[in-house]
Amino acid sequence: FNSNKCIGLSQGIYPNYTDIDSYNMAACCIDTAIRNLIVTGCDLSTVALLDNFCWSSPENSEKLYQLKMAAKACYDLSLAFETPFISGKDSMYNDFNGYDKRNRKIKISIPPTLLISSIGIIKSYNNLLTIVPHSIDDLVYIIGKTGNEIGGSEFAKIFTINNNKVPQVYKEIAKENYNCFSKANQNKLITSAISVGIGGLGIALSKMAIASRKGLKVNLSNINTIDKKID
């Protein structure tokens, strides 16, 4: 009870990505679960993961392949980030076989889904970060690059945009960014932070603005991008 340490818990889930690219779906789940902890002050070296696979029948060859690629991503990302899986839970055959109101045979299967949970340690509550900017003089920095990767997003669904590229995790770059972020936080260079996730940068900035009750002034014209053009 005399320790200054804190525990962080988070998760990542992107079921809409599975039918497009189950490997990068799983990679995004892992990266998000980790990144959500990093921005609270957790050090990457303390992070561990748990998986929860909820899948339809693997007797369907397509679903089995999606499962294989998702599991491969778990293996690859766990090694790349040096974040071990310490537990997990799998639920298979989530299918309904029955009849509709006209007595016709039907089969309803859940979207193949992976939930990644994460746990990490903040070495001291003095390094704990929230999403609330502390001062009207705070500067907003965006770490990392964005790309023309909106496949599986709500935006693409609403506006019927045909983009079959889901976000890709650049493991080495992400790991370096997370370690640099932690060093900056330990040196008291960061006052608040948020992880960009579902809804993208707009939602992340909106959350910070609402939390601060002051608003934010941002200019995204020079945002770093992976691709030359963002449609």
Language-model features: locations:
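Glycine-rich phosphate/pyrophosphate-binding loop regions near the starts of catalytic domains
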Residues: 1-148, 153-163
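Well-ordered alpha-helical segments embedded in enzymatic catalytic cores
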Residues: 25, 29-32, 176-180, 204
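Glycine-/charge-enriched secondary-structure boundary and capping motifs
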Residues: 63, 70-77, 81, 86-115, ...
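Glycine- and other small-residue-rich loops at beta-strand/loop junctions that grip anionic moieties
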Residues: 132, 170, 194
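C-terminal transmembrane module of polytopic alpha-helical membrane proteins
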Residues: 169-176
